[in-house]
Amino acid sequence: MKVHEKVSELIGNTPIIHLKKFGINVFAKCEFLNPSHSIKDRAAFEMIKDALDSKKINQDTTIVEATSGNTGISLAMICADLGLKFIAVMPESMSLERRKMITLFGARLELTPANLGMKGAVDKANEILLNTPNSFMVSQFENISNKNAHRKNTALEILRDLDNELDIFVAGFGTGGTISGVGEILKEKLEKVHIVGVEPLNSPLLSKGEAGSHKIQGIGANFIPAILNKEVIDEVITVSNEDAINTAKELAKSGLMVGISSGANVFAASMLAKKFPDKRILTMLNDTAERYLSTDLFA
């Protein structure tokens, strides 16, 4: 009998599905099947585990993080699983379903004015850190454990499940953890692999140096994260809000209930499939559509 004692033991080893409708050689890794239904479970667990192992935190530490969504939900789940206190700070403009998920896990939620954006949330998180004894900021955009979660696990799962046969890897980037961690290992193991980054058409920061507002939550953070390894990215494809949302809706018609950034990833992969029909392409299905009930995905 194989049973698990901790929710964190359920993270990873997500299956890969063949998306024939979007290209004969297009495949996707189903990260929405992680326990809190997003790829961020991987990084959240690794960041907390490494902090515990290195004695940066203990069972009495209060974890603090400024977050706009999935990372906050994943951290709330991990902290609940491990018996840690967690305070999430997010702009009040974030969706109601995100707020409710975080508090459902027992975390404390602090909202900041919408007009201050993520900077306002970061400033408030730093204030809480200063005023809370034995507290720790996760700092997902700078925390190398974020990237290492994908080096140690995600990338190796991909190589194992595809028998080391992959030509193109496609991923959006928010913190940069997934594309950097997976990309670094794939580059080490597969001589000719091509790594493609996906960013919003309305915020082509890496490809054109321009930042703007967009509707593809989870990618396009409007700044270059410290852990993003630009050296592993061979090409960047921009995807419009409409194409990302419409592709997510098409995925739903195939039975895959995924979010907007997953739509962006699959749209980019389908474009590459038309250009390179004989190449094996893998992308990521990052999270579940249920996280977007109040967005244009359900309009």
Curated annotation (Swiss-Prot):
The modification N6-(pyridoxal phosphate)lysine is found at residue 40. Pfam families: PALP. Its EC number is 2.5.1.47. The keyword Amino-acid biosynthesis applies. One of its GO terms (molecular function) is pyridoxal phosphate binding. It catalyses: O-acetyl-L-serine + hydrogen sulfide = L-cysteine + acetate. NCBIfam families: cysK, cysKM. Belongs to the cysteine synthase/cystathionine beta-synthase family. It is an enzyme of class 2 (transferase). It comes from Campylobacter jejuni subsp. jejuni serotype O:2 (strain ATCC 700819 / NCTC 11168). Pyridoxal 5'-phosphate binds at residues 70, 174-178, 261. Keywords: Amino-acid biosynthesis, Cysteine biosynthesis, Pyridoxal phosphate, Transferase. PROSITE patterns: CYS_SYNTHASE. Its cofactor is pyridoxal 5'-phosphate. Pathway: Amino-acid biosynthesis; L-cysteine biosynthesis; L-cysteine from L-serine: step 2/2. This is Cysteine synthase B.
